[in-house]
Amino acid sequence: TPDSFYADSRKQTEVAIEERIQAILSEGGQIIDLGGYSSRPDAAEVSPEEEMKRLAFALKILNTHYPDVTLSVDTFRADVARRCVEEYGVAIINDISGGELDAGMFETVARLHVPYIMMHMRGTPQTMQQHTDYADIMEEIMLYFARKVRQLRLLGVNDIILDPGFGFSKTVDQNYTLMGHLREFKDFGLPLLVGVSRKSMIYKYLGGTPADSLNGTTVLNTIALLNGTDILRVHDVKAAVEAVKLVSKTFNFQLSTFNC
């Protein structure tokens, strides 16, 4: 996307995309996650046609030069997800809305037989920060996932990954409440994905900007790993891979990294 909150993740030319992919793979990234619609707070609306155009441009490059790379697409639109899987071989659907913004998403994922990353968010990227009033944030998100996991399983979808949605319809304090209770999400018996890379929960608390937030990101990634996180969604692959390796070495278990 041209308007991602982190400038270094905005890759729009063929050369820039190829250079970024080469860097990700050389640093140990395992999955490439592509988005054509910025999900930052107050992001501009993007039409389905424009979103698909942006994704297709990058996917064609990946299919041509990196045919063996595992691809994920970040979209809340069922038809965009379908086209990415059927036309470009995308392996994973990453939906920030958990099916809330497109009623056809769950059935589409069921037909496509691909893993589904389900995130918690209220509202839309444009309105989500107006919806941070929770009586009990952990209870609400646990109930949200319980309801949606049940719906997906009734449709035959069992390959589900949970993402609590750091920074999406949550205040800074609420984000840290989630971080402190991450292990509770393991009660579902499903993989847990965490994406905190350079987000405002870091630089609004510590001061600075997204560009200043790598150290904070690494600390939170480490806390997440120690509390049951299976997949990290990151910008800075090398730092994340090193965190994974050190935690894995210390506690002798296997973890994954997930790049954006």
Where are these regions (language model features)?
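Active-site-adjacent loop and "lid" segments of alpha/beta metabolic enzymes
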Residues: S4-R20, S39-N63, T70, F76-A78, ...
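Catalytic domains of carbohydrate-active enzymes, especially glycoside hydrolases
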Residues: E19-G35, N227
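Phosphate/pyrophosphate-binding loops at sites that engage ATP/ADP/AMP, CoA/4′-phosphopantetheine
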Residues: L25-S26, Q30, A146-I160
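Hydrophobic "anchor" residues on beta-strands that sit immediately upstream
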Residues: G29, T70, V90-A91, D159-I161
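Short, basic/glycine-rich phosphate-binding loops at helix/coil junctions
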Residues: G35-S39, I161
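Arg/Gly-rich low-complexity intrinsically disordered repeat tracts
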Residues: N252-C260
